């Protein structure tokens, strides 16, 4: 039987698939084995294997490599795309075949790295990472532009021109903006570190101040403890002996057994050690307060993290030493401590101490005892009385008079700052859920001016400086009204003669002008009345004729035009069309929005 020959292209396709699989595996492994700072390790074994695969490829194999890189880029986020961009940069500068294939068709590369088509291929992730990727890509393209191998290449120039004309890429100023943002963040970090340093310095000065006080108090506490309970653990200095006793005599001395029921020392307060005990308790209480203050300082320093760790640890060590001293002082039992002496009031300074005899004291005590006996007897009698008698007494009693003040509240609280109780209005009192009143809705607030202002009256008769109007009326008489400045009918009061004419020329001209204006107003009113009567007779009356103002007329006219159904339909159609275009522009590639 004849064997069928396999076609040659099958073996070629298998080799391409194998190389593609190897490149993809090396690429994935290479991306997984990145360093923590986001930079590629060009000395790693996966990178060397990937470099060998690219170097061994021909033109078709190189196209396959670019396809694998672009496919991986499309499925990766912006941080991984920055790493793949470094691979593109490395292969572009090392292998001419890779460079030629990439420059022949850079459209997909530009879409994935520069977001030249944000509707079709938007950058994934946050906007911050996208801007960083764009800046990195612009830096790479600018470095390619300066290379000798592609400096005079028309394709490279077209690529740069395309990026400059694209409105989605700021090719000229993109790096400058990122640099300005980086400088701004650096300034903020420096300012933050300076504030932290100042805080640490403040806490350090506070700690040293507390430390100086605590050392003084510790010395005082230790001294008083040694005075109250002498320490027998320290070795006493050797005292030279004057006796002629020999060591054999010392060895022959008798031994004693001492039984101590409780090792906790007890101190009974007496007149001899009263001052020492008081100083001991005061020093211990002050040290407890210092320990609490140091604890608060440590909590605040822990919020600063690394800059305040050293000082916080120093404070903790010092605080533990003070705490041990306070715990040691707590072991002392003080029996019958004297209560603290009451401070003398300032009002007692005006009194003089007078010696009272024992007879006077006995008389006062006897009088107090008699008063107590009388009160107890009255209470027992009231209990035994009948309830009817008690009711009769209640009726006979006069009502208690309410105390009144013979002057107003303004004098009672004169010069004092008083805040009256505010009664909030609850706007939601009819709702089934209670909520607090809104701000600004407070009622029942009394006027504060009544406590700071007062009207004073003067005794005597005020001089009558009122003038007579003397303006001529329609009846021919002169106006007899009196007032200080103006007459309610004729206006300003001026000097007039016996016939009612103003004496001054200016006042006479002003009065003539006022009369002319009044005549014009009356003529205008008569004209309006005549026109209205004529219109009412000739003009057809509307069905619902309502008198409206000018602003209401404008509102009605605009309402008639804007709220027309055809106008609303036309405007809503335009708004829907613009909204649909905006959605299609931003989310056209996502079917879930339509």
Swiss-Prot record:
Recorded coiled-coil stretches: 170-198, 503-540
Location of the region described as Disordered in the Swiss-Prot/TrEMBL record: 533-558
Record's compositionally biased regions (Basic and acidic residues): 544-558
Zinc finger UVSSA-type: from-to: 466-493
Encoding gene per record: uvs-1
UniProt keyword list: Chromosome, Coiled coil, DNA damage, DNA repair, Metal-binding, Zinc, Zinc-finger
Cross-referenced InterPro entries: UVSSA, UVSSA_C, UVSSA_N_a-solenoid_rpt
The protein's name: UV-stimulated scaffold protein A homolog
Organism field: Caenorhabditis elegans
């Amino acid at each position: 039987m004849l064997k069928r020959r396999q076609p040659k292209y099958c073996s070629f396709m298998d080799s391409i698939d194998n190389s593609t699989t190897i490149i993809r595996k090396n690429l994935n492994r290479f991306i997984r084995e990145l360093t923590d700072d986001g930079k590629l390790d060009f000395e790693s074994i996966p990178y060397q294997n990937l470099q060998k695969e690219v170097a061994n490829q021909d033109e078709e194999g190189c196209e396959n490599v670019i396809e694998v890189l672009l496919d991986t880029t499309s499925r990766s986020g912006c941080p991984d795309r920055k790493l793949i961009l470094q691979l593109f940069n490395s292969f572009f500068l090392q292998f001419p075949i890779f460079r030629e294939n990439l420059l022949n068709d850079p459209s997909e590369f530009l879409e994935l790295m520069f977001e030249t088509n944000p509707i079709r291929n938007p950058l994934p992730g946050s906007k911050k990472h996208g801007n960083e990727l764009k800046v990195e890509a612009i830096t790479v393209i600018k470095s390619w532009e300066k290379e000798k191998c592609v400096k005079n290449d028309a394709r490279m120039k077209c690529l740069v021109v395309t990026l400059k004309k694209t409105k989605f890429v700021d090719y000229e100023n993109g790096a400058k903006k990122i640099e300005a943002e980086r400088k701004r963040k650096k300034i903020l970090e420096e300012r933050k570190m300076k504030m932290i340093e100042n805080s640490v310095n403040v806490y350090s000065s506070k700690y040293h101040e507390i430390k100086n006080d605590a050392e003084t108090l510790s010395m005082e506490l230790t001294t008083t403890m040694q005075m109250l309970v002498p320490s027998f653990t320290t070795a006493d200095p050797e005292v030279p002996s004057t006796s002629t006793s020999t060591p054999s005599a010392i060895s022959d001395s008798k031994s004693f057994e001492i039984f101590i029921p409780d090792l906790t020392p007890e101190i009974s307060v007496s007149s001899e050690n009263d001052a020492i005990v008081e100083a001991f308790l005061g020093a211990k209480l002050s040290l407890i307060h210092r320990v609490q203050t140091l604890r608060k300082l440590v909590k605040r320093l822990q919020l600063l993290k690394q800059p305040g760790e050293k000082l916080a640890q120093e404070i903790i060590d010092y605080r533990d030493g003070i705490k041990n001293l306070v715990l040691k002082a707590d072991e002392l039992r003080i029996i019958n401590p004297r209560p603290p002496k009451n401070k003398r009031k300032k009002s007692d300074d005006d009194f003089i101490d007078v010696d009272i005899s024992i007879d006077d004291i006995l008389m006062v005590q006897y009088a107090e005892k008699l008063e107590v006996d009388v009160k107890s007897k009255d209470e027992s009698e009231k209990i035994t009385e009948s309830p009817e008698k008690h009711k009769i007494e209640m009726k006979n009693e006069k009502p208690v008079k309410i105390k009144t003040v013979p002057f107003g509240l303004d004098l009672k609280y004169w010069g004092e700052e008083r805040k009256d109780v505010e009664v909030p209005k609850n706007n939601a009192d009819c709702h089934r859920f209670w909520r607090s009143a809104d701000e600004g809705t407070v009622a029942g607030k009394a006027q504060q001016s009544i406590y700071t202002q007062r009207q004073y009256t003067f005794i005597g008769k005020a001089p009558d400086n009122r003038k007579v109007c003397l303006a001529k009326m329609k009846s021919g008489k002169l106006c007899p009204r009196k007032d200080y400045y103006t007459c309610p009918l004729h206006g300003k009061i001026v000097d007039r003669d016996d016939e009612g004419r103003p004496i001054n020329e200016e006042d006479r001209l002003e009065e003539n002008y006022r009369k002319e204006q009044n005549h014009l107003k009356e003529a205008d009113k008569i004209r309006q009345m005549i026109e209205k009567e004529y219109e009412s007779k000739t003009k057809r009356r509307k069905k619902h004729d309502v008198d409206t103002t000018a602003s209401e007329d404008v509102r009605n006219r605009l309402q008639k035009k804007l709220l027309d159904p055809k106008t609303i339909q036309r405007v809503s159609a335009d708004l829907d069309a613009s909204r649909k275009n905006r959605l299609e522009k931003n989310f056209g590639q996502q079917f879930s929005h339509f």
